[in-house]
Amino acid sequence: MTKIRSQFPAVFLRSLVFTIAAAMLAAVSPAQISQSKIVRADLPKPEIDRIVKKFTDNEFMFRQALMDYVFNRSAEIQTIGMGGQVTGVYRRDSFMTFTGDGRRFERITFFPVSTLTEISVTPEDIEDLGGVNPFALEPSAVAEYNFTYLGKEKIDELDLYVFDVSPKVIPNPKKTSQRLFTGRIWVDDRDLMIVKSKGKGVPETKQNKFPVVETWRENVDGKYWFPSYSYADDELVFDNGLSVRMRMKVKYTDYKLGRTEVRILEDDD
């Protein structure tokens, strides 16, 4: 079975420009989305370590905060034929809210019959689209990754640190269901928050292949960077020789605080 998975947390004016740019991504091509103009530069290792510690701390805090927000999610997955025509579509629109006892609950608002025939979407895939990036770059996971600082890139009004991220050891899929992230992240140089990521999950298996997904985030309530738009246009090549081109678009909108116990942890740094 083929699994399609999502990749993927207070300065208002700066974040507003970045949010508007993310909202416009649906109208641009994959090549435009992926353009990168990194200015190569070195930083002392202690400074790199400080940046990594700060943005991983923030990532943990924002993931916890996201669980207290309701939002709308629109997900569409397409398979693309040799001539560029759409050969199958999976569409699922949802309102992500809570049950009476506070658990996350997906209320489906639009879910037509899927016409996908070459790949399938599993319940686990849908769970990944719930809004919380399954590849947690949090303090507890830092030891599992190599973070390579590449330099800086300016996107709209934001100056961003750019890091390549790769697992030190690829998990053995025969022994564990753990997946790790391999790809690239962009970190705001003032607030030290991840505002963009591009990568995929590893390991892959004979039947489960994952696309490279690019995710942009938007500033919510002036303090959190939550997923805004995810996009993939990739070719999945399976061990039996089957090759499937797929395209995925996921939009997250209308974030609202659904519970009141969200707290911002102040950092003394």
PLM features per residue range, with description:
Residues 1-4, 26-29, 225:
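Extended interaction regions within the primary functional domain
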Residues 1-13:
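N-terminal secretory signal peptides that target proteins for export/translocation
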Residues 32-182, 189-196, 200-211, 219-227, ...:
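Structured extracytoplasmic
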Residues 14-27:
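Bacterial N-terminal signal peptides
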